[in-house]
Regions:
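Phosphate/pyrophosphate-binding catalytic cores of soluble transferases and nucleic-acid-acting enzymes
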Residues: 1
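Feature activates predominantly on carbohydrate-active enzymes
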Residues: 70-240
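Gram-negative bacterial Sec-dependent N-terminal signal peptides
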Residues: 4-21
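Acidic, contiguous N-terminal accessory segments
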Residues: 8, 22-91, 99, 106-120
Length: 241
């Protein structure tokens, strides 16, 4: 039984790892809190599956020792070729799958070899990510998409959008809606961030020309409402420089 919509029981290990750039020597990064492996390995074809358990699904031994915090998980690979994941939320299950990807090495064909053992891991730092908040040419849309996927693969959870030379984030157009093409890009960034369990934070930088009036206070709120319609759910106000 799986308590999450993110991943379904019966997910093929080989299918999940297909197309991944698997390392010749597996390594988990960031380094997990606890790990215990034997010298054994197990080979997978398309048949083995992943069982994911959550407290909502009734719990199991897969949750033993897993702290109740976002992103925590346990990953168990048995000598019999069974893969189990215990997590309290979708982010934890997602991170466990990233660890599984890091542990896999390809055989000569389409199969995958995994080490036998278990990992219990959880984040020490609540907010893990970057701020795109510099002056100069902002990152391209493609670079941002690549960054968001990289964050998910490496278990980071925060991206703050605040490039100072975006005139719709800063002056002179922070009060105005994004043009349609740029709005569509924001929507896609939010979507990809969600897929990778990254919190997309959109920041406004109004300090160059804001007027300390009720009108401009309402303009800030209106801009946040515009961004909300694009899918943004986390916001920041920058007065750093």
């Amino acid at each position: 039984m799986n308590g999450f919509q993110l991943l379904q029981c019966g997910l093929s290990v080989a299918a999940f790892l297909a197309g991944s750039a698997l390392a010749a020597t597996p390594a988990v990064y960031p380094s997990p809190q606890q790990s215990k492996f034997t010298s054994q390995t197990v080979a997978f074809s398309g048949k083995p599956s992943v069982t994911i358990r959550s407290a909502k699904a009734g719990g199991s031994k897969l949750l033993d020792g897993v702290p109740e915090k976002s992103g925590a998980y346990k990953l168990v690979i048995s000598p019999q070729g069974k893969v189990g994941i215990g997590a309290h939320d979708e982010r934890g299950a997602f991170y466990a799958m990233q660890t599984l990807r890091q542990l896999g090495t390809k055989t000569g064909g389409e199969g995958v070899i995994l080490p036998v053992g278990e990992i219990t891991d959880w984040p020490d730092i609540e907010f893990r990510g970057t701020v795109e908040g510099f002056y100069g040419t902002p990152w391209s849309h493609e670079a941002r998409l690549s960054q968001l996927r990289f964050y998910g693969q490496n278990k980071m959870n925060t991206y703050i959008y605040g490039p100072k030379d975006d005139p719709y984030h800063s002056s002179p157009h922070w009060r105005d809606p994004y043009p349609a093409d740029q709005a569509a890009q924001i929507r896609e960034l939010v979507k990809v961030a969600k897929e990778n369990h990254v919190d997309f934070v959109w920041a406004i930088h109004p300090g160059k020309d804001i007027k300390w009036t009720e009108e401009d206070m309402n303009n800030v709120i209106k801009k946040f409402e515009m961004m909300y319609k694009l899918g943004v759910r986390s916001f920041a106000v920058f007065f750093d420089d």
